Amino acid sequence: GGNSRGLLALSSRQGMHRFGWMFAYGLRRSDFFKLKKTDVFFTNSFTQGFQSLVNEINGKPKFIVLEDDYPSISDSLKKNNFDLIYVKNDSNIEDNIKNAIIKFNPDFLAISVVQWIDGILIDNNFLKSLKLEYKNLTIIADGTQFCGTCNFNFENSPFDVLISSGYKWMLAGYGIAFVLIKNNF
């Protein structure tokens, strides 16, 4: 309907702007990551941003998550009693993810772009191929270990949402994080 821009209701987006998800600072970030300035929000950490985001998701969707991924991902999803499908994080990570998608038909893939435990970078081309093949799959990414390491165009990425703490490679210090949301979410 008219009040929705995808899964996240317009009122939720407006609330994010009112309650600390500072819009003005998003202007520069939008240029840096190549996205619309209205799709950038700020929060104090990845964990807070992710938890706030998943609190807005209704129903009981299925999420694919990686074993040993950043604990805030699975912890936040468990708190909301979502169905979690754990995928083994090993040398066959891409096959493991794709096989789980085929078998379980999840609504979401929640994943760190770079795994915090071993530094494995998830291939964006692999994720793009998943988005092309599985049109209803929504990808939410933790970009904390990734953002700032290379050029990144959010609009051309496979991610529907990317959340990143700024303390890692963005040199922002603790207490600064950002949420990038595509219009279809």
Could you describe each region identified by the protein language model?
Residues 1-24, 31:
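A glycine-/small-polar-enriched, mobile loop at the entrance of the PLP active site in fold-type I
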Residues 72, 116-119, 170-171:
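Short glycine-rich, flexible loops that bind phosphorylated cofactors or substrates
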Residues 17-29, 35-61, 71-73:
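Conserved beta-loop-alpha segment that forms the PLP phosphate-binding cup at the N-terminus of a helix
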